[in-house]
Amino acid sequence: MNTATGFIVLLVLATVIGCISADFQGGFEPYEEEDAERIFRRSPTCIPTGQPCPYNENCCNQSCTYKANENGNQVKRCD
């Protein structure tokens, strides 16, 4: 067995031992629902003036109207 193979074997062994000890210490327990909501909570953002808007409530000023784009097509943009 050469040095590289021995290093890989030791790395795999350390990973397996680490996973086993994390499981014994409760490292793989599922998150509680409130923890998941805290971690994945979306920050409130709004679409600035002049940007395309699919819904009025996403615009910073809550107003969205049809305007001509560079191709002459009518698209909804935040006012």
Curated annotation (Swiss-Prot):
Pfam family, one: Omega-toxin
Record InterPro entries: Omega-atracotox
MF term (GO), any: calcium channel inhibitor activity
Intrachain S-S bonds: C46-C60, C53-C64, C59-C78
Record-marked site positions (Critical for insecticidal activity): P52, N69, R77
UniProt entry keywords in alphabetical sequence: Calcium channel impairing toxin, Cleavage on pair of basic residues, Disulfide bond, Ion channel impairing toxin, Knottin, Secreted, Signal, Toxin, Voltage-gated calcium channel impairing toxin
Signal peptide residues on this chain, from the entry's feature table: 1-22
Known tissue expression: Expressed by the venom gland.
Domain of life: Eukaryota
Subcellular location: Secreted
Keyword Ubl conjugation: no
Propeptide section residues: 23-40
One Gene Ontology cellular component annotation held by this UniProt entry: extracellular region
Function: Inhibits insect, but not mammalian, voltage-gated calcium channels (Cav).
Record remark on domains: The presence of a 'disulfide through disulfide knot' structurally defines this protein as a knottin.
Membership in a protein family: Belongs to the neurotoxin 08 (Shiva) family. 01 (omega toxin) subfamily.
The protein's name in its UniProt record: Omega-hexatoxin-Hi1d
Organism of provenance: Hadronyche infensa (Fraser island funnel-web spider)
